[in-house]
Amino acid sequence: MIQNEVSATHGSTKKGITYNTILEAAQRPTPLVPLKKLKVEHQLQSDIYVKLEYLNIAGSLEDRTADKAFQFAEEIGVVRGDEVFVTAGGSAAISYATVAAVKGIKLTIYAPKGEFDLVDTVLHTLGVKTVELPFGTFAEARVQTDEAAQQKGVFSLNKFTTNAAFVANLQKTALEIEKAVNNKSIGKVGAVVIPLNTGAAAAGIAAYYKGIGEHGVRVVGVTCKKDTIPEMGLDLKNDLLQEYNVEKREVEEDEAYSFTRHLIGTEGIMAGPSSGAAVLEAIKLAKELPAGSTIVVVLMDGIRNYLRHFLDDDWITANKKDVVTRKDGPQPNSIYDPKVLVYDPTKLAGEWTQDPETKSWSHSEVEFNKFNPERPLVLDTVLDAIGKTPLVKLQHIPKAHGVKCNVYVKCEYMNAGGSTKDRIAKRMVEIAEKTGKPGKLVPGVTLIEPTSGNTGIGLSLASAVRGYKCIITMPKKMSKEKSIAMASLGSTIIRTPNEAGFDSPHSHIGVALRLKSEIQDAVVLDQYCNPGNPLAHYEETAEEIIYDMGDKHIDLVVLTAGTGGTVTGISRKIHERIPTAKVVGVDPHGSILAGPAETDIDFYEVEGIGYDFLPGTLDTSAIDYWAKSHDKESFLMARELIRSEGILCGGSSGCAVHYALEECKSLNLPAEANVVVLLPDGIRNYITKFLDDDWMNERHFLDA
């Protein structure tokens, strides 16, 4: 049950929310975002809003169906530990696997040939068994699944899946849309457009409008002419579509791929191809409807499953798709003035000052934002989907590791761009737009940023929305998934040698400085020195933690450290508001953030944490003490979080949780103690890394 608490301990009278499982966080409505740029580009007289279903807990609209299907199964006696079979592929398979992980169900998923190709690594990590059948249709696969379940004497979820999709979207998706109408956040809906997978979701939405007497609302389902786009048209229930008057429209595969890439780069909507196809048809529909109409597009899923698919230029070329590939961006000149490399990343811009009485902080150059805990149903842009991430209590892992206290994790991978770095990217851009520091931002200007990846994704997202060009310099060890995610948002990516120190002209910092000197009016926001980095976490992240914990006293906060902005900003706010709480920073062996200043280890695999210098954004005095981390334990814990709790987190998240549990045991924290751990990002960027058994085995991380 969701816990609603009144925060007495921390001085607030408002209610905060924590969730007992990640599945409870699925009850949060997904936001609506208007497509402003595309409206102008296509000279539309109607408004199109997209519903960001990829911000669900497992990344798709199918999460709603999977949750409801298991609820139906539990009502007839399925319990934790039972074995269940289901037929599903693609994003739906991940949704069922995630719900099964949370509920402790032993799940076997059957699917036609090829339906696991984009998701098999994630499914394996979630602990489900997959059976690929030599059939071409889901109808045939369902028959085989049901027969196999009957022979083994286990439950087949197939009897509920269609009804679950219908009911979940009738009771939740459609209702969330109508709440936005009732709140006058959007105009009366004239049409809802949705990708057709089975069609049951579209039928459920149509049934909702029919049930409330809104017979004028058109529900339009979109499918692919040749059934070649993932998540589209492979398992249609045409009888349902006819019964509830769902219109069908078709798109060409290559047209959908091209448009979806354009949608991502123009609006920052990180959607999968079926979602892009639906938006494309919504634009065509908008030209048919009366001026002033409102169209809502329900997005099926996001980019996670497609980073080695239609978003990858290599895949486009290999599969001979009629899609324009990206052009190479600028490279720094080989001859440069050494003076451009004069730079000190250890000095923070401006000064922080603490009031000796209130203990609150201020900054000499930046006006602070007031914290607002509300999560609107309708956002101005996708950048407003950054923040307000859920705080979830771990149910199984602490006990399995001998920890008595309560451990809550803040799921930052549910930010719009997929990580906690979205926050600092947004804040640094806001500050530059308002103050002109560290450079003036106007549409068309070039942002350049050296980063390990996640800040680059956040800045690429902000640049797409705000109309800036973006160049990201990044070490080669960072995943290809990160590079493709940034490129899909319109950024140019330049890779640099892993071994190059920060002061080398060939490092990601050195290359960024050289490019800045060569590109007119280019701006380096500089996450290592920019006050917006710690400020984003002081103003927002820490406030969210305190607000959501309510009257549950916080004893310990555990944070991984990279640029230092996260640990500095959160620690300052926590110490200001809860003086008795302790904050622990986690730093990998091979990094010098927590010391020693010199180390024999010069390489570590966990991405996004640690550095070979002390950034200006890091205030080491704000941290009570440090823990040094190892790769193996970090990755194994991340996998355990995925499999045992259904929390689809990245390697640095595993790092934070592993060392949080070690600290809980070291301190012998009692059952009533509360620990908060921040999970920086999710699995999207690491599917070919720590989620892959071969990658883990090559590094001996799976050795006993």
Curated annotation (Swiss-Prot):
Keywords: Amino-acid biosynthesis, Cysteine biosynthesis, Cytoplasm, Lyase, Pyridoxal phosphate. InterPro entries: Cys_Synth/Cystath_Beta-Synth, TrpB-like_PALP, TrpB-like_PALP_sf. It is found in: Cytoplasm. Pyridoxal 5'-phosphate binds at N454, G562, T563, G564, G565, T566, S652. Disruption phenotype: RNAi-mediated knockdown causes developmental delay. Larvae have shorter body length. Larvae exhibit homocysteine and cystathionine levels about 10x and 1.6x higher than normal, respectively. Knockdown at day 1 of adulthood decreases longevity at 15 or 10 degrees Celsius, but not at 25 degrees Celsius. Decreases production of hydrogen sulfide (H2S) at 15 degrees Celsius. One of its GO terms (biological process) is cysteine biosynthetic process from serine. Induction: Expression in the intestine up-regulated by prostaglandin E2 (PGE2). Expression in the intestine and body muscle up-regulated at 15 degrees Celsius. Pathway: Amino-acid biosynthesis; L-cysteine biosynthesis; L-cysteine from L-homocysteine and L-serine: step 1/2. Transmembrane segments: none annotated. It catalyses: L-homocysteine + L-serine = L,L-cystathionine + H2O. GO terms for molecular function: cystathionine beta-synthase activity; cysteine synthase activity; pyridoxal phosphate binding. Its EC number is 4.2.1.22. Its cofactor is pyridoxal 5'-phosphate. Its main location: cytoplasm. Signal peptide: none annotated. Monomer. Hydro-lyase catalyzing the first step of the transsulfuration pathway, where the hydroxyl group of L-serine is displaced by L-homocysteine in a beta-replacement reaction to form L-cystathionine, the precursor of L-cysteine. Plays a role in maintaining homocysteine homeostasis. Involved in cold-induced somatic longevity mediated by prostaglandin E2 (PGE2) signals from adult germ cells, perhaps acting via a role in the production of hydrogen sulfide (H2S). Required for normal development. This is Cystathionine beta-synthase cbs-1.
